[in-house]
């Protein structure tokens, strides 16, 4: 099988050999009501670092207002020049004014700004700050404190978890976000030295009333009373490069399951730790995303990307290592037997949530998914990755109803822009572009290839295909495909290239990889346009940080790599994926030895989306510890928001996004939930033709009590039922809309006298003029008691 990895060009889902693949693409070719704003009073100055802005215009906008100094503002269509004599003279003038302003209060400029802002950074006392604010020529004095990423590049901000009106604040702060909940990570282990897992050592004292969920040691066991009233009991298993003392009050269990791996892999071929220590980085990334510590400063290759946090930072982690590397499988793989042993352990230990970012099959009888029925029956919410085989239809895995299958969506990108010598600008992803790179000659890779290299290989910037004499100092255009994306930039660096433009020649994802040289990744039609321009003899380009193009980024969208439905194993009678979450260019902790000594890195894949949902489930269990896994799933799905299409309009393609992008700010009070349990799952399987030997009646699979409605073959008319459970008493009005289909809900108003009461509704769908053999998307809404739950509908009309 081919592994779904950070570095593979493409991936094939396969489990015929009992091996699962980690669903990562990191380098693969992928509400609480907000109150009315109140104008705050100006805070009193405090000692610290400030930005002092002066009234004179900066170079970019200066029009010659100062006698003797000519204008530096560029003409329309021209770029700002900071190297001209007039710009240098005006900069000297500004810096002199800045020094004079600082000297008035006995301060010293630490850094000067003159191009987009006329000001300086300095350290000030409160009195100095107050004095400068009143000084002539001073526009403002602003405290230079660390700023939260508010532009949605950070999934935590995008999911509305952070901030004064965010989910964490509503829960009482980060210290309560997931408190009393244990998240199990079945993956490649973890890197215990990471700050994302740092915490106090475990003691032996019993928890007190002030902190009833404090974990503690009892002999070789680690115990923690949970929010649901149960007790988690785990172990910290010693092994290779892992003493067993690494567990703490954040990571309260760490075990390794390698029996099958060891039996299938000769000792001479093993490259991983036979212990919970992560030999790949995938598990560390996943665990820190789901429930890593809050406010961890993250830098990549010396560049700070602010602070990162796990979705449920107060939740505890239990690590179950099931994925291992070898010389024949350099990216970690999972053997079914090892995974099954780990699932057993997780159930026994008493985790509340499991994340499994590993491939499966598209059948209903996959052994891993079958084992997860037991986990779900035990009250464990299981989040799984949909797969990275998109954008084609029917490419997903984990199609069973008792797990939550997660697709990958985008957040605001770390943008970069390619500015061509002809003035055209093309925006893409530019994680490694800081400030400005160039101007420099822009060349195609083929034009700077070694004489002995094949042209097709050179187009891909394959290793040892480019010539140092030809490529040094230039920005090289490399085609996406076949060769790992980061290996392309490594080849450009090897020959002294100044930067790289990575181009998709067909529609595909653009990815925030950590490249060896400054790189902008462009999708079609921009990529081919840049490549065509690069063929000109005097082509030049500059790489710029940010978006300078007039084409805005639309987000969230479903990544092109994210696997799509319908689910083959159910004949399209169960919607999969269930939900979407951020999974593109996600920054989290990794294992340094296997990630070029980085402590943090950007990964992409449904592997990264799944732990966001696992963390969201942990938040929900923290508020509703007695809810079933399917109640949590329903709350997440029915409060989701539809993603966007490339044109910025909302998408109804539920086969790509499931119910939509998760909105944890809405999920705690969905109004109603659509719940299910083991008997429902067995009836579903019986309806699909499986012999369960459970003595349950078979149901039409479309009648399974899911928070979605899917009919893979609608011939004429069909009625399905859904049983609603009230989270909040009240009257709920139903509305339904399915284009080309006459749709009704009976009763149209559902009255609940108390929370916990259940009522059944019938939804009848009759084809009117819907096209045949094509999925039609609609929705049912249940609105009442100040809430609204939306249930996605997917039907395919057939003649017979």
Spans of model-derived segments:
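Substrate-binding/access-modulating region of protease and related hydrolase catalytic domains
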Residues: 177, 193, 278, 319-408, ...
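Soluble metallo-hydrolase cores and metallopeptidase-like ectodomains found primarily
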Residues: 264, 269-270, 525-588, 592-600, ...
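Secretory targeting and sorting signals
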Residues: 1-33
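Terminal connector regions
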Residues: 770-800
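C-terminal subdomain of the subtilisin-like protease fold in secreted/lumenal serine endopeptidases
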Residues: 512-540, 579, 622-714, 789-794
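Secreted peptidase-domain scaffold signal
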Residues: 337, 341, 347, 358, ...
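Subtilisin-like serine protease catalytic core
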Residues: 43-47, 62-64, 134-135, 169-335, ...
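Inhibitory N-terminal propeptides of secreted protease zymogens
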Residues: 35-150, 728
């Amino acid at each position: 099988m081919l592994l779904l990895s950070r570095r593979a060009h493409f991936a094939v889902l396969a489990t015929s050999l009992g091996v699962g693949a980690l669903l990562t693409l990191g380098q693969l070719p992928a509400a609480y009501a907000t109150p009315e704003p109140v104008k705050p009073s100006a805070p009193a100055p405090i000692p610290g670092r400030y930005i002092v802005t002066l009234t004179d215009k900066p170079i970019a906008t200066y029009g010659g207002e100062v006698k003797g100094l000519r204008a530096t503002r560029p003409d329309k269509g021209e770029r700002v020049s900071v190297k001209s004599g007039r710009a240098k003279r005006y900069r000297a003038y500004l810096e002199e004014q800045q020094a004079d302003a600082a000297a008035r209060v006995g301060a010293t400029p630490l850094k000067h700004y003159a191009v987009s802002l006329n000001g300086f950074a300095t350290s000030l006392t409160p009195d100095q700050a107050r004095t400068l604010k009143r000084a002539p020529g001073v526009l403002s004095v602003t405290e230079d404190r660390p700023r939260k990423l508010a532009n949605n590049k950070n999934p935590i901000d995008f999911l509305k978890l952070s901030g004064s009106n965010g989910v964490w604040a509503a829960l009482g702060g980060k210290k309560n976000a997931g408190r009393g909940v244990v998240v199990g990570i079945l993956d490649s282990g973890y890197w215990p030295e990471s700050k994302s897992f740092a915490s106090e050592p475990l003691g032996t004292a019993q928890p007190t009333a002030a902190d009833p969920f404090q974990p503690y040691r009892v002999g070789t066991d680690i115990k923690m009373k949970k929010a649901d009233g149960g007790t988690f009991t785990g172990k910290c298993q010693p092994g290779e490069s892992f003493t067993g003392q690494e567990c703490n009050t954040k990571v309260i269990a760490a075990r390794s399951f390698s029996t099958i791996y060891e039996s299938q892999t000769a000792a001479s071929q093993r490259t991983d730790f036979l212990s919970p220590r992560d030999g790949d980085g995938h598990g560390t990334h996943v665990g820190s995303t789901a429930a890593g510590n809050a406010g961890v400063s993250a830098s990549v290759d010396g560049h700070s990307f602010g602070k990162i946090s796990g979705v449920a930072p107060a939740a505890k982690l239990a690590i179950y290592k099931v994925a291992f590397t070898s010389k024949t499988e350099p990216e970690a793989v999972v053997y079914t037997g090892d995974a099954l042993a780990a699932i057993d352990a997780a159930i026994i230990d008493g985790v509340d949530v499991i994340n499994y970012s590993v491939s499966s099959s598209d059948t209903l009888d996959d052994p891993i998914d079958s084992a997860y029925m037991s986990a779900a029956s035990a009250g464990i919410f299981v989040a799984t990755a949909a797969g990275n085989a998109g954008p084609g239809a029917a490419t997903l895995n984990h199609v069973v109803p008792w797990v939550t299958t997660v697709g990958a969506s985008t957040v605001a990108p770390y943008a970069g822009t390619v500015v061509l010598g002809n003035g055209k600008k093309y925006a893409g992803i530019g994680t490694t572009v800081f400030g400005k790179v160039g101007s420099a000659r822009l060349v195609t890779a083929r034009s700077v290839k070694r004489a002995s290299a094949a042209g097709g290989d050179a187009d891909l910037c394959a290793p040892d295909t480019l010539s140092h004499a030809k490529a040094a100092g230039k920005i090289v255009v490399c085609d996406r495909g076949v060769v790992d994306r980061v290996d392309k930039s490594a080849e450009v660096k090897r020959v002294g290239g100044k930067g790289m433009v990575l181009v998709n020649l067909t529609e595909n994802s653009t990815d925030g990889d950590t490249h060896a040289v400054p790189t902008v990744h462009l999708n079609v039609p921009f990529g081919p346009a840049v490549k065509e321009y690069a063929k000109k003899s005097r082509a030049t380009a500059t790489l710029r940080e940010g978006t300078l193009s007039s084409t805005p980024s639309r987000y969230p969208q479903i990544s092109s790599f994210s696997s799509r439905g319908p689910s083959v194993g159910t004949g399209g009678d169960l919607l999969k994926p269930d939900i979407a979450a951020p999974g593109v260019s996600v920054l989290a902790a990794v294992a340094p030895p296997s990630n070029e000594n980085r402590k943090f890195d950007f990964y992409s894949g449904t592997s990264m989306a799944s732990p966001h949902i696992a963390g969201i489930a942990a938040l929900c269990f923290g508020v509703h510890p007695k809810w079933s896994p399917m109640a949590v799933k329903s709350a997440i799905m029915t409060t989701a928001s539809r993603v966007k299409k490339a044109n910025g309009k909302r998408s109804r393609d539920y086969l790509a996004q499931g119910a939509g992008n998760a909105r944890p700010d809405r999920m705690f009070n969905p109004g109603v939930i659509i719940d299910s349990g083991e008997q429902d799952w067995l009836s579903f399987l019986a309806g699909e033709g499986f012999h369960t030997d459970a003595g349950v009646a078979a149901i039409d699979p479309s009648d399974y009590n899911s928070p979605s409605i899917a009919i893979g073959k609608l011939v004429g008319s069909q009625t399905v039922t859904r049983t609603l459970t009230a989270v909040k008493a009240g009257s709920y009005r139903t509305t339904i809309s399915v284009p080309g289909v006459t749709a009704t809900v009976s009763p149209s108003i559902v009255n609940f006298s108390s929370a916990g009461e259940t009522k059944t509704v019938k939804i009848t769908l009759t084809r009117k003029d819907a096209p045949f053999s094509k999925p039609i998307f609609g929705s049912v809404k249940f609105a009442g008691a100040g809430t609204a739950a939306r249930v996605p509908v997917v039907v395919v009309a057939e003649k017979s």
